[in-house]
Amino acid sequence: MSKKIITGKVVSNAMDKTITVETDRLTKHPKYHKFVRKTRRYHAHDENNECEIGDIVEIEESRKLSKTKAFVLKRIVRKNILSEEVETPDSVEEELKEAFGGEVDGTTRE
């Protein structure tokens, strides 16, 4: 029997070596025949803690690793572009101090 491979989005990585992956699927309502979006969350093992929130990943079914964890991270399909390091205001202030050679208090001169 082949192992299930599921593609989804990482919504949490707060636990050590564990990620929460959310998948969406469309199902047709039996009575109203309207498509309804269903969401399912899976816990997966991330050995190297390499996933960030927003990454698109593939997880593979494995033996039960804990009470709720039965999948293992197979690969990261696409990294979240927002997980890149963003320039913080502190680093901008330091660059301004270096550029103008003095104290920067955040006020503008006219």
Swiss-Prot record:
Source taxon at top rank: Bacteria
Species classification: Bacteria, Thermotogati, Thermotogota, Thermotogae, Petrotogales
GO biological process, one term: translation
One MF annotation (Gene Ontology) recorded for this entry: structural constituent of ribosome
GO CC list: cytosolic small ribosomal subunit
Family: Belongs to the universal ribosomal protein uS17 family.
The name this protein goes by in its record: Small ribosomal subunit protein uS17
UniProt cross-references to InterPro entries, sorted A to Z: NA-bd_OB-fold, Ribosomal_uS17, Ribosomal_uS17_bact/chlr
Subunit (UniProt): Part of the 30S ribosomal subunit.
Protein task: One of the primary rRNA binding proteins, it binds specifically to the 5'-end of 16S ribosomal RNA.
Keyword field: Ribonucleoprotein, Ribosomal protein, RNA-binding, rRNA-binding
Gene transcribed to yield this protein: rpsQ
